[in-house]
């Protein structure tokens, strides 16, 4: 059996056809239904002229349809393409054009944007509309359920581990780029993650999967996962769905389109969830508030099934982790550090196992390299760029120059340099400083925003914070904190600056503080530094 998502999932569907694979609100799909519906979609794609390496774009909110359409693309050896549902016309057109998309599956509420760009996308052969109450805006679109009903399931294929898998970056460091992987490498990585979560060793070969899945199922120990982050980004999709489905588990997606802590906890309770995947403090705090509110009204949530919470992509502070453990003490909290371009390391926090914010155990294949090409010595206090080895992509789709800059060979080993900087502690752990393109140069000193954000959020009354640099005649750039406060907080600029100076060197402390009602973040919780910088510039009287 080849290591390929579609092939592994087909073997699971054959082994446990009647077990639930997908849940969205009241809609539940068994593994047999999941497999059959994806096979019908694959047949529809092929009937429209798509085939091996064809790109199927998914302009969808979280839900069963996202995963079914993705599986359908995998089945025909196509390439599913994630599309940010926040994109407006030009962003949408850019990504679909750049990806060479031949099919587009979209929620009808997003149809007005689709209608305005499709005439500029001559490669699009097929449009499939998922009805969410606002249909009929795209004349050429076929209804999702009609497409499934109109096609018999596609016969299963022999696939190659060399097939391309691709995920588009969020565009936080420029225009979105498609990061390409061998699907065999990608599936192998995530095949290794789900089984330890249910107490089993990972399979050494995909042919072992059906027997392991049967063992898990018979023991009543299936991995039920809730991705609270959007499936259009790697954290929600990879950690929230691939990990569970490769172990024969179920994925429960939320029906709300903005994060509601009560919905997350209620869904975890009702589905006996084992795993919740989220993104940092911004997604954890609403869960903590919801837990407390339910307890105060005398109707606490039963979260006894919950074993693990995984976060990736942004800062997850020690203080917030401890608050979560105070309420759900049996949890293992896994803070994974990495990017679309590669995995770097992780941090585990449990009751009795403390952790330090931004300090991670690095993967054995991770190095930190100085500007002159040396490996950073542990305990030296030198700063270097993180080089992630092991799981390294093929490159960026249609961008050989950026591929050559990002994916480099050192001493015969290929590494990914995504732009993250770190120090190496004496014990070999990584002290993450942040993304290099966000570094603030103030008075000749380099200031990493994440370090200042962490310190700012420790000041009583601060709910959230982003730190940016604003042009300054004296310092070049002035460190500026964009801050939102907790309800009823009585905190001013001087208190925040003083609070940071008690924790960090004076040159790192904000010189200005801009107060906003809410910190700008993407749906996956990642920082929107562009908007934060605009807030800071506006406050300083600059455009």
Please identify what each model-predicted range represents.
Residues 130, 505-527:
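AMP-binding/adenylate-forming catalytic domain of the ANL superfamily
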Residues 171, 246-247, 273-278, 289-356, ...:
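Gly/Ser/Thr-rich phosphate-binding loop
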Residues 18-63, 71, 88-93:
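Conserved AMP-binding/adenylate-forming core of the ANL superfamily
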Residues 150-168, 174-175, 198, 214-224:
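Conserved pre-ATP/AMP-binding loop-to-beta segment of ANL
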Residues 367-387, 426-427, 489-493, 527-528:
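Conserved beta-loop-beta connector loops within the AMP-binding
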Residues 187-227, 232-277, 290, 294:
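Conserved AMP-binding/adenylation subdomain of ANL enzymes
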Residues 47-48, 78-146, 158:
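Structural core segment of the AMP-binding/adenylate-forming
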Residues 87, 93-94, 102-106, 389, ...:
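AMP-binding/adenylate-forming catalytic core of the ANL superfamily
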